[in-house]
């Protein structure tokens, strides 16, 4: 498993040029988990980037999102080559899940982060979720319906799931 986190809420970046990530289990991001930490709202420096240039991410199982790859807080994935195959997510993004984090949990309640400091109309300009595929293959991934994510989705994005405002 590849795990990258910046606890200061700055840019978290990881690149995979080859090798194998296989047969892992986790709640989110069973193969690859990239998270920008705890950013301050409105801080455009806060982002999580993963570049996949080669290798394989296979047979990983996430009970919630991102069986193969999970990237969150202004999450961006660029796939130039490689294989994402036979990964499973219990809710969303069997192969890849990337989030902008517009919805969060505050005081045990699911609310848009706009209620706690980042206005909705600026959100897409500050935090974006994206996926670019220039090559490689995404095949045989699954998203089941074992629950719902914070957006109310379930069983979506078997190959790729992008949640952006």
Regions found by a protein language model. Give the residues of each.
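Surface-exposed loop/turn motifs in large extracellular/passenger domains
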Residues: 1-25, 33-61, 69-88, 96-165
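The feature encodes a structural signal of leucine-rich repeats
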Residues: 30, 66-67, 93-94
């Amino acid at each position: 498993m590849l795990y990258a986190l910046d606890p200061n809420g700055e840019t978290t970046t990881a690149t995979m040029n080859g090798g194998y990530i296989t047969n892992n289990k986790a709640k989110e991001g069973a193969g690859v988990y990239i998270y920008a930490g705890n950013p301050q709202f409105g801080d455009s420096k806060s982002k999580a980037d993963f570049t996949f240039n080669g290798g394989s991410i296979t047979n990983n199982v996430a009970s919630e999102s991102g069986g193969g790859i999970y990237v969150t807080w202004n999450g961006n994935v660029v796939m130039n080559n490689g294989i994402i195959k036979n990964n499973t997510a219990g809710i969303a993004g069997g192969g890849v899940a990337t989030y902008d984090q517009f919805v969060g949990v505050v005081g045990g309640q699911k609310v848009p982060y706009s209620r706690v400091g980042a206005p909705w109309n600026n959100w897409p300009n500050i935090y974006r979720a994206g996926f670019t595929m220039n090559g490689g293959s995404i095949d045989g991934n699954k998203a089941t319906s074992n629950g719902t994510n914070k957006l109310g989705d379930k069983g979506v994005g078997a190959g790729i799931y992008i949640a952006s405002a």
